[in-house]
């Protein structure tokens, strides 16, 4: 684990950093780098709606190609599925020996969708939290833990550069963990697919379906399997699984011990291993690339099917009654 004393901020302060993208992580990195005394420019395509926001926040903005030509450290924070084209069209033609190409996630490097020249340092700085939290913690004098990894290191100084960058966005205040592009990518994808997004979503929908099919009102089913999930996850987030079990009733704890293994059993773990193998051998990324090349038709169809599930209909109606719940723009419009 690395902390503030292990990183030299002057290293990144002596470089010119181009941040490509201004989404959740892009804005947090750019603003915190600037506040740490680093020269920063943001790369966005002509016509991007985010350009005005970048200028309003006092940052310089230009096209990705122009920023890549100006910078000697390029942090690529555009969506995973857009990165390969941005690299090919805007970044690669403007790379020079000694430049560094940074990522916030290892997918494109690990699976060979982006292949930088051997003379370029390739590293990753990945905060383990959303951009708004990274920025808020930085402003408060704190930080969010980060992962760093170095994939190509022609100068032998890649790790020091990555640590310096992590320090500039507050990561070393909390702690920085050294990893590899392989481990970060595969664990991140597995967590998303098997547990955080895919697994949790399907568990919630299955619980809702069983209750409604058994004759219970959909409103009650929604509260029991989705609305209250936040209460449980917050307890686990704050103090682990043991804290959650300590905080719930004895009835809930006892029932969970008995019934949880009936839902998530050895067969579930076998299927999780299959998901992990699909990630490790590149099958998932092949499907991801095929979807993009097909105009995102498969993703759009899956999205359509998902929003039409009854839990989404009853959920929107119930959230209309909850003044304390922050509503997304897409739902309030």
Curated annotation (Swiss-Prot):
InterPro entries: 6-PGluconate_DH-like_C_sf, KARI, KARI_C, KARI_N, KARI_prok, NAD(P)-bd_dom_sf. It is an enzyme of class 1 (oxidoreductase). GO terms for biological process: isoleucine biosynthetic process; L-valine biosynthetic process. Mg(2+) 1 binds at residues 188, 192. Residues 180-325 form the KARI C-terminal knotted domain. Substrate binds at residue 249. Signal peptide: none annotated. It catalyses: (2R)-2,3-dihydroxy-3-methylbutanoate + NADP(+) = (2S)-2-acetolactate + NADPH + H(+); (2R,3R)-2,3-dihydroxy-3-methylpentanoate + NADP(+) = (S)-2-ethyl-2-hydroxy-3-oxobutanoate + NADPH + H(+). Disulfide bonds: none annotated. GO terms for molecular function: ketol-acid reductoisomerase activity; magnesium ion binding; NADP binding. GO terms for cellular component: cytosol. Gene3D superfamilies: 6.10.240.10, NAD(P)-binding Rossmann-like Domain (3.40.50.720). The keyword Cytoplasm does not apply. Pathway: Amino-acid biosynthesis; L-isoleucine biosynthesis; L-isoleucine from 2-oxobutanoate: step 2/4; Amino-acid biosynthesis; L-valine biosynthesis; L-valine from pyruvate: step 2/4. Residues 1-179 form the KARI N-terminal Rossmann domain. NCBIfam families: ilvC, PRK05479.1, PRK13403.1. Belongs to the ketol-acid reductoisomerase family. This is Ketol-acid reductoisomerase (NADP(+)). The gene is ilvC.
